[in-house]
Amino acid sequence: MSILYGNYRQKGNTNDIFYFSALAHHRQLIDPDTVPRHKKYLKCLRALGIVYQLSRFKPRETLCRNCHTKYIKHEEKETDVAIAAKLLEVLHLNKCDTIVLLTGDTDLAPAIKTAKTLFPKITIVCLFPYKRHNDELAKLSHTHIKIKAETYTKHQLADPFELPDGTKISKPPSW
């Protein structure tokens, strides 16, 4: 858990780690390895006991402001809602006394406000990905930490990463 907490130390146990993402099927034409690479990463997370939940990308027609050409843009949908729902579920089931959210997404602000109102004794910590500080979430959380670039390098998965069945997954250059 020191990987997530950095310089924030608090006694306690890690009960569950949840990972929320979406498979970018729409990028397959640009980078055919996008989804298979992501699926390999998910296998590694599962092997570490991390529970993942996948959302989706939704295509949306957009108009270029400069040339007025229409194009399709893909937006990740439901991930923030899934995180908010899991946050409230975990708190409702009394599974923890501290929540650590690794995000810079302001869309989670209402869920954090609700969690603090309904469960005032819970400590909420926000970890901000490198260069993704969020003032609103910082104010809402009990404490917040900015993850430094070197933290990512320091806490990479083993390369290769060995799954419980002996399968080895090599780290792609883009990880």
Q: What residue spans do the PLM features occupy?
A:
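Nuclease catalytic cores that cleave nucleic-acid phosphodiester bonds
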Residues: 51-175
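Domain-level signal for Mg2+-assisted phosphodiester chemistry and nucleotide/NA-binding surfaces
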Residues: 1-73, 123-127
